[in-house]
Amino acid sequence: MDKINKIKINETEYYHSDDILALKMKKFDKCVNGRRLIDDFNIKKPNFIYAAFKDDEWIKTDGRSRKFDKVFVKVSWFENYIQENDSDDDCSENDSDGDCSENDSDNDYSENESDCELYNEKNNKCTRYY
């Protein structure tokens, strides 16, 4: 299972946008880079920053250098976004059994699916949450 690393910049925890995109989550399929991620999902400051790696640490920057300034998304924004939009992936208004709750057994962890954190047997799909 892939694990996304938290990076602390100026006492705030962030995820590197490249790490988020490397998760290959369906909702981020159209995002080719961190700048596209903040545009497509309308992420506003202070929920993201630009930073450059200098002298073995990440330093907050203004984002003018596309080559060196990387996008970092606040851990709290990312986790809240995933939780708020979780039901969009697994359930729809036209759900055939009408039972689309968080306690639904098809959303439980599965020991059989080593690559997945959550495996939904109903639609045979894997979802990762970090």
Curated annotation (Swiss-Prot):
Q: Where is this region: Disordered?
A: 85-116
The lineage's top-level taxon is Viruses
Q: Which family does it belong to?
A: Belongs to the mimivirus L5 family.
Q: Could you identify this protein by its name?
A: Uncharacterized protein L755
* Native species: Acanthamoeba polyphaga mimivirus (APMV)
Q: What lineage does the source organism belong to?
A: Viruses, Varidnaviria, Bamfordvirae, Nucleocytoviricota, Megaviricetes
